[in-house]
Amino acid sequence: MTIEQSPTHSDDVRNVYDGFGRVYGSVWGPNIHYGYWENDADDSSVEVATDRLTDLMISGLDAQAGQRVLDIGCGIGHPARRLVRTSDVDVVGITISHIQAAEATEHTAEAGLSDRATFQYADAMDMPFPDGSFDAAWAFESMWHMPDRGQVLSEAARVLRPGGRLAVADVIQREPITPEGRVVLDHVCENYGVSSLGTVDEYRTALAANGFVDVEIRDITDNVIRTLGLMADAFETVRDKLADVVGKEQADSLIDFVRRFGSIPESGYVYLTAVRA
């Protein structure tokens, strides 16, 4: 059974990232996503590990020089800029946070990449692009915020050209729900702009239903789950600053539930690639 909540409104997700996004960035860095560690002995820094996960996405996307890539849920654009530099592509990023779009645009100008990467406010379930506008697309930890993943995949298929590649990194439900897990997952869904946690089987079904083929799904939970404990530790160092932004009760709850989310067996993570038929 999948953990489901009432459909997340755009305002819920926007408020999460607008509310403490800058505090998050001050302790975690510019990558608003998990890190990837090769094994238990890997002592890479958060910066190295988060860039490594970006590089995994870049490799799977396999975008070619000069192609146009859509970043679905772009955050402040750090992975997009890395993609531009690595693959010599043009990127269009979309987000439902005006603040994130502005920050991404500012940071991209500072990096001298404004002619290669642009960012705008848009709804991933109703994209403002013509059919066949992009050669490739990725969704980097944005899908669990979507009220209807199938609709996002339908839109991705629509704006991708035939043969276009899709890469997704997403938090999923890995195991059947236990009573303890339900408490944690319900709290995460209700308080942090998360609509639901899907499963691998649900992804396979939704991808096939929307015309994607050559689907490859890799469970990388063991490589990324360390993120949550480290993130809780990082938030702990700025607890007072976080409390100033979201309130003491919410700050305490955030730190507690991030740590607990990383310790329950239901908490999983997948990296997948597919091709638009």
At which residue positions do the language-model features occur?
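A short acidic, Gly/Pro-enriched loop at the edge of an enzyme's catalytic core
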Residues: 125-136
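Class I SAM-dependent methyltransferase SAM/SAH-binding core
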Residues: 68-72, 76-126
